[in-house]
């Protein structure tokens, strides 16, 4: 504080000296802090002038000190005014002012200090006196942001003092309260109470609700409890004063209304114009209880939806052109209310069309957006859960709308008198013919739009985190509520209630025709998918943020599925279109059934034509597994390789030698099943719940059912030995297909069992020993990888294979090598393909690996074999010799990655994908029992040759000789 702050009262005190107990009281003259501080502040003129000051940080600090220095609570009126000044300053300046006066931002937002410096929770607070408050109010006349509000407060203060005489004793308060209740009209449904007017300032006559203490922009546009608890006489006189300054309202952005203005209250006033005029003049104020204020606030919020309710009649009368209407959302003016409504519905209103998925409450402004959302199979978009506060408010408003439609006329507020309003020329009427504000009396009120009055408060936006804000009881509507979350049946508050169900919007005048087209398009796109596995589920796991916002523009249009037609029409359209809906729905159902049957037959024919010719060409030796028949087993790598070897040419070649595979009889029997039954079974099981086996019309309905019914059921990993569980199948499948997460489980299982899943692999090695036992294998440094271009729905596969030796190639070579069968991963490999296009994956991309292979101390480099621990017989040679049918495929055939099921157009793109994503599958430590995997041969060899890393491992098992 300044060193010389003298007292303004007639005393000899030259400098303010804070008291030891009460810091706001001077120890020398016993006068208060405000009496001294006013000596440093400019006294505004008594009569209002047009000259105002610019808000500056140092001036705001001086005025803030009048109410914050040495106090623990702020009067409500002064906090309103100070908020206006703070909103003009930067947030850093506001924080500096508060901290200099020993106030935190949380306490200032709350309006009082919660705990003292020692941490004790306060139960009583020091606050400035009423005389100091009046003196401080005058300082706010200096600024244009607060001048008009202070003038209204002064008028209210003057009339309150002239009308109400304070009681002399405390017992008279109860007597006066009872007597005032006796004179109250029976037409008012809510009990009102003036309380003890002498001991309570009208602006402190608020309900005990913390919502008023939060920053203004957290409400839309005003705390509901505050609206319901305002003294009516004050609000009426506020509007009267505002009506006398229309020109100032046009030019001054901050001076057209006080903070306590509200559109919802204005609309309720419209409904009260026909109230009986026999109500006594004593009913000039109302203090609503906590319980009633919430229900009233709910009604008041819902009245602000429609453009008719949002258009301010005073703005219409003050517009540049007579008859133009004003959109409060974007500040644009329009020729008439019809044009405004079209603009409002198209730009600002997003509540026209409800999602057709059962249980989803999302609503949209256009059918296209609604259909795009409804066709998305992601169940998280349709779950009846609280996505955020906006959706919660939307659902609450929807429930309130349905329950309050027929019991609206419960809340009325009677204005003291109903004469013509001075200062407004001409009558303003709404679209339904009811007078809007033309008959409000001299004490009537007009509440201008709060949006132009209340600026954005920067000091509330950035520094205050949600955790710092007060935990406020009661309903706290979020910002987007009134602009986008109220159903259409509340669009016009002043129209008769019996006419509400008949109101239709322009966009939904022909809903059946549009929905039929959307259903047909969705049905075509749904059947274009080959199987359910190809449909992206888009299920976001629980630990991932959901970035599918209710804004439907982000939903891909490719994921349309069949729309559900059982969803009832909105309340406003049900009565008018019930008969047409029934007829059209029946026709649609029949059309969809015929379309489904026709497309099923076409799919069956395609499936037959794709399977039968190949069986005839191969003489029945080659077995083809369609996409629907690929076994879903815990070890996809080994089992799929086994099935393809045994179902392909290798099985036929070995069978010609008289070797039998008794355990593969089941795979032979599968071939005798009718393709018609298989295709039909696949089609029926496409949309079947895996848990309860219920069938659904489309994938979206099935996913929604799974989330709503089986939400708590987890999906366990399909790999045996892995106990991981996931909340969604998509997360489970993504985890199960990642072999890097299951290397330990896979290798342990491979070592423990030789009869379970790998019997074919072990048997193949025994067969190789018997058939080629006279051949001597010469070890050489080489490593290859084989791509089998199979013809099943799974596409081609890639597997790491063991050593390939040049001597064995020469011994086995009874014919030319299969073209395109072997793709060399190493530049030092002795095996080359005849075709240059299939010779190598990347000659320079793996040069490091080829060089690293020569660094082995023992002269050879063992790759990961088909069966762990037994890797000396070149199975790839057997496969190349036996499966001649694989070589006949064209080189440009799309390649499917066996690990992630992605399809690539050529070897180049597949090679790049496999080496960058799945290369860890190729290089395993050579020490038996060590399951460490490496991305390069050099790293693997360096690890394998380090004995210190394998001390704890048991001795390696003997290899086959």
From Swiss-Prot:
Q: Which residues carry this modification: Phosphoserine?
A: 505, 509
Transmembrane region(s)? none
InterPro entries reported for this sequence: Disconnected-like, Znf_C2H2_sf, Znf_C2H2_type
What the entry says about post-translational processing? Phosphorylation on Ser-505 and Ser-509 leads to cytoplasmic localization.
Q: Does the keyword Cytoplasm apply?
A: yes
Biased region (Low complexity) positions are: 826-844
Q: Provide ranges: composition bias, Basic and acidic residues.
A: 548-560
- SMART domains from the entry? ZnF_C2H2 (SM00355)
Q: What happens when the gene is disrupted?
A: Viable, although fertility is severely reduced in both males and females. Males have significantly reduced testis size, with progressive degeneration of seminiferous epithelium and loss of germ cells from 8 weeks of age. Sperm motility is also reduced.
Q: Which residues form a coiled coil?
A: none
Subunit annotation: Interacts with HSF2BP (via C-terminus).
Name listed for the protein in its UniProt record: Zinc finger protein basonuclin-1
List the lineage, top down.
Eukaryota, Metazoa, Chordata, Craniata, Vertebrata
Gene name of this polypeptide: Bnc1
